[in-house]
C-alpha cells in the first residue's frame, strides 16, 4: 500500500519506512481507521465537541509545531497491542489519548512532532458495567462524562448513583482521571475515586491492577484476556496484594489504560447549591475554605466572560484596571470574588450546614448569600454550578474562552495550601504578571481536601502571534515565580513539561532519575509518549528535545 507523505515525519524515519509502518498498521486496524496528516491545510481547529485529532486547537506556537504524522483509531484491545508491538519493531513514537480534548494543556498534540496519534476513543467507548450495590462503573477510554451521565439517566440509575463531573462534560473519564483532573462533589478527586485498571504495557502485554490481577473463578478462559470477566472485587478494593502500581500510570508514559473502574457517589438524599459574593480583593485573605465538597472561588472576570465577551463590556484592548473591573461586577451584581459551593444530605442536615456557612462567610462586610432561584440573568454561573455540583455535565464554561476574539486558552495550575494569605500572594503575583503580558487575569481557586488548585486561565487570540508569544512568556515567567515560593504545578501544557519537571529537583533531581529508570526498564525503545511530563527515554537526547525557557515579552503600543 502506498501512503501520502506526512507533514512531519517521525524522528529518524524516511518516507519509505513510514509508509511501511502505515501499511502494516492498516493491516492490523483497518486502513479506514488511519488518517495521514499530509498538509498544514488539514490542521483545522474544529471545536470542543468536534476536536482536532492531530494538533492543539489552542496552539501557543504555530499549529504545525506539535503535530502528529498520522492518526490511528484502534478498534479494540488486540489492535492497541498490535500497534504497540509494531511501534517497538520500528521504534515509532506513539502518543495515545482518549478523547483528544485536554483543552488548555495541549489537546491531542504529541510532544514529539511526527509521532503517531493513537485515538482510543473513536471505537473503544463502551460503558462496560454500572453496579448499584458497589456504586461503581467500568468504562473504556472513549466514555465521556456526558455519556456516562446519559447512561445513568437512560437506565433510571440517577436515583441511586451520581457521577462527579469537571467543568466541561465532553472529556474522557479515563483521560481526566489519569491526568489527575478534578470535579466538584465530595467525589471530586477523580484519580482518588478510580478503582482497578486494565493496561497495555510498552511491550504490548496486558495487565490488570489491584484485585483485577486475581482471576475470577469460572471466567471463560477461551475468551481473550481482555474479554474475560474481571474479579468481583476489582472495582471495590484498589490495592490487591503487593506493590501498588496504579499511580505510575498517571501523567506518565508507562502504559495505555484501556479499562478503568470509577467509584460513583451514592445519591446523598438531598442537595443545595449556593453562591456567596465578596466585594473586594482584600476579602480573599479572610475567606475560610474548608467545606463539604470541592468549592470554587472565582474571580469576577471569569464569571463576566461566561456572560459575555470583553467587547460587550469595554472597547479597551489592554488589561482592565480595578475601577473597570468593579464596574463590571456592579453591572452583573456579583462580587470581585464569587464563591460557589453545595451541601448534601437530608434537609435538616443541609439547613445546619448552611447556617454554619452563612455565619462564617457573611461576617465579611459586604458579602451576600444567593441561592439559584435568586438569580435570573442569562448564562448564570450559579445555575451552571447548580448542575455541575450534583454531577450533571454541561458545556456552559466554554463561553469564557470567547473573552478574546479567536479565543484560546492556556492553563497555569499551581498548588498551595488552603490559606487566605497564600491565595492572596499567588493572586497578586499572577495578576501583576498578566498585566505585564497585556492580558487580563482570569482565574479560580479550587479547594481540595488539604490544598488549593489555583487555575489561571490565560485567554488569548490564537490568530495573533504577539499574544501567543506573550502568553508563552507569561506562563514560563509564572512557573519560575511560583517555584521561588515553593509552589509547583500539578498539570501543564505539553510545551512546558520540561520546565515544570525541572522545578521538582530535590536532591539533585532524584525523582526524575527514578522516573527515567522506570521508563527505560519498561519501555527500552522509548516508543510510548516520549517527553511526556518531562520524562525522556534513553533513546532520545534530552538536551536536544527540551524547549528553551526564555521567551521575549512584546509590548504593543496599544497596551
For the regions a language model picked out, list residue spans one by one:
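Conserved glycine-rich FAD pyrophosphate-binding loop
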Residues: 2-16, 20-23, 31, 60-70, ...
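Conserved oxyanion/phosphate-binding beta-strand-loop segments in alpha/beta enzyme cores
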Residues: 24-59
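General beta-strand structural signal in soluble alpha/beta enzymes
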Residues: 34-39, 73, 94-98, 118-120, ...
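Short, flexible, solvent-exposed loop/turn segments with mixed acidic/basic and small polar residues
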Residues: 56-63, 124-130, 260-269, 324-333, ...
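FAD-binding subdomain of flavoenzyme oxidoreductases
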Residues: 127-130, 139-291, 557-558
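C-terminal cap/substrate-recognition region of VAO/PCMH-type FAD-linked oxidoreductases
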Residues: 245, 261-262, 270-283, 287-389
Amino acid at each position: 500500500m502506498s501512503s501520502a507523505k506526512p507533514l512531519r515525519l517521525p524522528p529518524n524515519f524516511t518516507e519509505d519506512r513510514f509508509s511501511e509502518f502505515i501499511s502494516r498498521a492498516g493491516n492490523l486496524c483497518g486502513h479506514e481507521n488511519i488518517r495521514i496528516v499530509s498538509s498544514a491545510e488539514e490542521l483545522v481547529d474544529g471545536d470542543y465537541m468536534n476536536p482536532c485529532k492531530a494538533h492543539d486547537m489552542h496552539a501557543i506556537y504555530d499549529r504545525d509545531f506539535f503535530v502528529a504524522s498520522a492518526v490511528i483509531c484502534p478498534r479494540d484491545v488486540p489492535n492497541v497491542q498490535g500497534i504497540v508491538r509494531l511501534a517497538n519493531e520500528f521504534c515509532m513514537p506513539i502518543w495515545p489519548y482518549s478523547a483528544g480534548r485536554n483543552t488548555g494543556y495541549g489537546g491531542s498534540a504529541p510532544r514529539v512532532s511526527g509521532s503517531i496519534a493513537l485515538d482510543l476513543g473513536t471505537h473503544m467507548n463502551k460503558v462496560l458495567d454500572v453496579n448499584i450495590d458497589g456504586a461503581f462503573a467500568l468504562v473504556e477510554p472513549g466514555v465521556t462524562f456526558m455519556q456516562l451521565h446519559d447512561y445513568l439517566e437512560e437506565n433510571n440509575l440517577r436515583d441511586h448513583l451520581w457521577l462527579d463531573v469537571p467543568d466541561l462534560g465532553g472529556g474522557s473519564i479515563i483521560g481526566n482521571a489519569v491526568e489527575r483532573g478534578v470535579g466538584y462533589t465530595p467525589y471530586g478527586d477523580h484519580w482518588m475515586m478510580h478503582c482497578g485498571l486494565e493496561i497495555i504495557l510498552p511491550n504490548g502485554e496486558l495487565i490488570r491492577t489491584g484485585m483485577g490481577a486475581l482471576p475470577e473463578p469460572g471466567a471463560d478462559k477461551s475468551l481473550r484476556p481482555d474479554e474475560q470477566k474481571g474479579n468481583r472485587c476489582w472495582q471495590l478494593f484498589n490495592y490487591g496484594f503487593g506493590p501498588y502500581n496504579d499511580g505510575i500510570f498517571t501523567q506518565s508514559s508507562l502504559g495505555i489504560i484501556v479499562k478503568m473502574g470509577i467509584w460513583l457517589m451514592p445519591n446523598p438524599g438531598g442537595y443545595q447549591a449556593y453562591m456567596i459574593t465578596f466585594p473586594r480583593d482584600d476579602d480573599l485573605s479572610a475567606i475560610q475554605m474548608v467545606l463539604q465538597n470541592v468549592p470554587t472561588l472565582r474571580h469576577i472576570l471569569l464569571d463576566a466572560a461566561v456572560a459575555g465577551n470583553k467587547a460587550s463590556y469595554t472597547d479597551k484592548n489592554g488589561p482592565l484596571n480595578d475601577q473597570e473591573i468593579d464596574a463590571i461586577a456592579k453591572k452583573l451584581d456579583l462580587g470581585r470574588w464569587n464563591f460557589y459551593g453545595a451541601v448534601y444530605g437530608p434537609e435538616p442536615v443541609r439547613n445546619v450546614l448552611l447556617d454554619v456557612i452563612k455565619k462564617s462567610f457573611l461576617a465579611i462586610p459586604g458579602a451576600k448569600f444567593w441561592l439559584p432561584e435568586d438569580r435570573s440573568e442569562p448564562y448564570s454561573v450559579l445555575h451552571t454550578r447548580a448542575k455541575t455540583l450534583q454531577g450533571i455535565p454541561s458545556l456552559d464554561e466554554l463561553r469564557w474562552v470567547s473573552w478574546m476574539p479567536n479565543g484560546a486558552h492556556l492553563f497555569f495550575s499551581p498548588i498551595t495550601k488552603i490559606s487566605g494569605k497564600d491565595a492572596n500572594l499567588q493572586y497578586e503575583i499572577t495578576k501583576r504578571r498578566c498585566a505585564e503580558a497585556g492580558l487580563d487575569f482570569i482565574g479560580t481557586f479550587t479547594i481540595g481536601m488539604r490544598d488549593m488548585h489555583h487555575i489561571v486561565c490565560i485567554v488569548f487570540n490564537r490568530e495573533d502571534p504577539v499574544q501567543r508569544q506573550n502568553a508563552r512568556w507569561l506562563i514560563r515567567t509564572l512557573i519560575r515565580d511560583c517555584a521561588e515560593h515553593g509552589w509547583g504545578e500539578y498539570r501543564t501544557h505539553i510545551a512546558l513539561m520540561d520546565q515544570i519537571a525541572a522545578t521538582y529537583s530535590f536532591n539533585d533531581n532524584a525523582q526524575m532519575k527514578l522516573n527515567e529508570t522506570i521508563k527505560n526498564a519498561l519501555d527500552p525503545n522509548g516508543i510510548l509518549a516520549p517527553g511526556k511530563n518531562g520524562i525522556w527515554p534513553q533513546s532520545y537526547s534530552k538536551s536536544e528535545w527540551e524547549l528553551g525557557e526564555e521567551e521575549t515579552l512584546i509590548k504593543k503600543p496599544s497596551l
